[in-house]
A protein has these predicted regions:
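N-terminal amphipathic alpha-helical segments
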Residues: 1-71, 75, 90-97, 109, ...
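DHp/HisKA dimerization-phosphoacceptor four-helix bundle of two-component histidine kinases
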Residues: 37, 41-44, 78, 85, ...
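A structural signal for well-ordered alpha-helices, especially hydrophobic packing surfaces
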Residues: 50-53, 57, 80, 84-94, ...
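Charged, acidic
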Residues: 62-128
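Regulatory helix-to-disordered linker/tail regions at the edges of structured cores
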Residues: 105-175
């Protein structure tokens, strides 16, 4: 049981990192002459993934007896690590892009759109496309993880129901 609670806490930590990135991304988009559709879309993707991770963490915690940390990590470690890595890259780029807002002259980004600043901070259009693909993949895989966790919970419920039903039938037979 403590294993599953620790697992849930780890997932919450990754979800919190996503929420933090969304907050920073939203503030960044607003701070440079209003919001930008591409920034909003990126924030929406990260927000959705972080929300699903939070739901997974809650489900795992509420059904702790059915989840073994080792098995769960073996199956989903890459997905969670990928999300965490993508959030980290985005957070780092946002910090760099925010600092660039005050720079002038050579290497500065004055007069560049919000999206352009973020692309510049990531290292270029190719890196931005890679990050977007990674975030999309995280969202899809976290959605699959959510479905797998929900199926596990349904399986646990079915096992409990079957055991209870078998016990009731047995109790009726011995009367």
């Amino acid at each position: 049981m403590a294993e599953a609670i620790g697992l849930a806490a780890s997932i919450v930590g990754i979800a919190s990192a996503g929420v933090s990135v969304v907050s920073t991304l939203t503030k960044f988009g607003i701070s440079f002459r209003g919001s930008n559709d591409k920034i909003d879309s990126l924030a929406g993707r990260v927000s959705l993934t972080a929300s699903i991770l939070s739901v997974i963490a809650t489900t795992v915690e509420q059904n702790a007896s059915g989840f073994k940390k080792e098995e769960f990590w073996r199956t989903w470690r890459k997905v969670l690590s990928s999300c965490e890595e993508s959030y980290g890259k985005l957070e780092k780029a946002l910090l760099k892009a925010r600092k660039s807002g005050t720079s002038k002259g050579k290497g500065g980004t004055d007069g560049v759109s919000v999206w352009g600043k973020l692309v510049w901070a990531l290292g270029g259009e190719t890196e931005m496309q890679d990050l977007e693909r990674s975030l999309d993949s995280c969202c899809q895989q976290v959605t699959m993880m959510h479905h797998a966790v929900e199926l596990s919970v349904l399986s646990l419920i079915a096992q409990r129901y079957t055991l209870n039903f078998t016990f009731i039938k047995f109790a009726m037979l011995i009367r």
